[in-house]
Amino acid sequence: MTLEVVSDAAGRMRVKVDWVRCDSRRAVAVEEAVAKQNGVRVVHAYPRTGSVVVWYSPRRADRAAVLAAIKGAAHVAAELIPARAPHSAEIRNTDVLRMVIGGVALALLGVRRYVFARPPLLGTTGRTVATGVTIFTGYPFLRGALRSLRSGKAGTDALVSAATVASLILRENVVALTVLWLLNIGEYLQDLTLRRTRRAISELLRGNQDTAWVRLTDPSAGSDAATEIQVPIDTVQIGDEVVVHEHVAIPVDGEVVDGEAIVNQSAITGENLPVSVVVGTRVHAGSVVVRGRVVVRAHAVGNQTTIGRIISRVEEAQLDRAPIQTVGENFSRRFVPTSFIVSAIALLITGDVRRAMTMLLIACPCAVGLSTPTAISAAIGNGARRGILIKGGSHLEQAGRVDAIVFDKTGTLTVGRPVVTNIVAMHKDWEPEQVLAYAASSEIHSRHPLAEAVIRSTEERRISIPPHEECEVLVGLGMRTWADGRTLLLGSPSLLRAEKVRVSKKASEWVDKLRRQAETPLLLAVDGTLVGLISLRDEVRPEAAQVLTKLRANGIRRIVMLTGDHPEIAQVVADELGIDEWRAEVMPEDKLAAVRELQDDGYVVGMVGDGINDAPALAAADIGIAMGLAGTDVAVETADVALANDDLHRLLDVGDLGERAVDVIRQNYGMSIAVNAAGLLIGAGGALSPVLAAILHNASSVAVVANSSRLIRYRLDR
């Protein structure tokens, strides 16, 4: 790939890089690669023009190395490129130039008028220069007006452009220039505030680390010989062993293979309480080692880590439009023509062009247009910091309106980590260990919590699991497996009865007893004969009862628990949690039906689950919430909100954040519309000049952005 050095002088080099054009991700890769070179001060890659500008120290920087870094960025894997916008997106030199030129022109005009006592009206030369400066400073508004007129929809730029043209026709060059200069300052301040908002979100989610320590083992020197080397973080690969010391963020998702430490996972889970990690513990990128040292074998790097997926989701979510945003846009679209009409009426009645100009300027509904997107972006960033991944503004708004919640029991209201409590052989030729081993063989590929509990139990007892040739999932019932030439059935008593397997009286008594104790029985049949039984118990989450009480206090009118378990087990759990409405032995389609029934009754329904069988209900609910990013991928992808940890208190935070975001949006609408209305009344009375109108317009827009920015840290320290 060829590079063209367009210019290189005084420590500033501009390089033409065609493959960066229209590719912001590759532009980020270039910025990341070049920034690591010695002597490089700043680098900006511009996707619009396909150029890269590097500011460097001529004494320290190696020009050839910089160019090599640019070339190398073309081959960086996409998943290793940080999820951010290019630095060039934050810099708009022409905007600054417009403000500077406009300010200098106004200063010179002020000197001419008040120092040299020249008349206010400009001569031909002065007017020509002032008009040129006015057109230059007002170019973004004029361009926007032309675009909106071509599309047949007059926007706010049309109002500003109309006022500017009227000023120039009336030879009010100073007024036009002053107004445009003030509006440019206002636009710049809005952009600055929004950039700070985005930067704050990024800093909350993403550390500033750019290197990592990797442990290399030399096979020829023995297994114990190892060397630690420091490498760029984007060169770490899956399988590398990363060494993490105290007060350093873990840069990869993976498993601890050496050492132990106390780790703060708040960036991922929102939980401020540190946890202890030892060999075998899975850890996430973004977690910080508070005390100790660990070596982590990388399972995911870059954008594929949990924190990388969160950042990507947050950036995608900000593009999703909330219904309340459409309200603001409809208002803006209708208000612009109304503003022209009101301004024209004022001109006809008073004959005062300056008054009409003032009304055009004060009527610009820019602040209304900013009201929703700024608040949504800030709230989504806040949620991500708490470990709440909200996939769009529409879901955030819905979260504040939910008045009925459907819970899947296992893994949401219960811990989701059941333990084996009993293993009973029901056939003379079978021992309990055999029953457990063949049950584990049936469940070896399943991620259901009950299956994982059976597998864990065999590992704890050091029982080998026999291989199987084939398996079939019987959704909601159990598993059918073929192993050692035999057919195995593992599941509920209903499954065995459906398959014509006789369930003995002893087995039935065991089943009844276990269900009264809120334990789940799994029956194992081999070649049509019942051979054993395994029981499992899943504890209710300690915070579940308190959270349900608070949900009711917060306006949730109906809470429904769904479970595939037997009614007796469901009854025990429901009684413990104070739930009056529950359904047992439900299939995935039954969960979907339960959600739709509530919707038909007029409720705004939230569905909380964590498994594949919850996916249809999660998709159908007004807002689907997946518990824990460790849940099944299908559930996490289907849900509208994913909670990074399993703390039910986060459900309260979801509703609270949604309500707060809507409150802030309404405040923004109220503030901006009030300013527009008051400005129109004052302007119609002739008490407002075009310059004051521009100042008021800017103030309302900046106030809206600042008000929305408060959501970034709303109750983060609670």
From Swiss-Prot:
Any Gene Ontology CC annotation: plasma membrane
GO molecular function terms attached to this record: ATP binding; ATP hydrolysis activity; copper ion binding; P-type divalent copper transporter activity; P-type manganese transporter activity
Catalytic reaction(s) noted: Mn(2+)(in) + ATP + H2O = Mn(2+)(out) + ADP + phosphate + H(+)
Induction or repression: Induced by zinc and during infection of human macrophages. Transcriptionally regulated by iron.
Keyword line: ATP-binding, Cell membrane, Magnesium, Manganese, Membrane, Metal-binding, Nucleotide-binding, Translocase, Transmembrane, Transmembrane helix, Virulence
Annotated binding of Mg(2+), by residue: D408, T410, D610
NCBIfam families on file: ATPase-IB1_Cu (TIGR01511), ATPase-IB_hvy (TIGR01525), ATPase_P-type (TIGR01494)
Role this protein plays: High affinity, slow turnover Mn(2+) transporting ATPase, which is required for virulence. Controls the Mn(2+) cytoplasmic quota and is involved in the uploading of Mn(2+) into secreted metalloproteins. Required for tolerance to Zn(2+) and oxidative stress. Plays a crucial role in the ability to resist zinc poisoning in human macrophages. Shows a preference for Mn(2+), but Zn(2+), Co(2+) and Cu(2+) can act as alternative substrates although at slower turnover rates.
Protein name (database record): Manganese-exporting P-type ATPase
Organism listed in the record: Mycobacterium tuberculosis (strain ATCC 25618 / H37Rv)
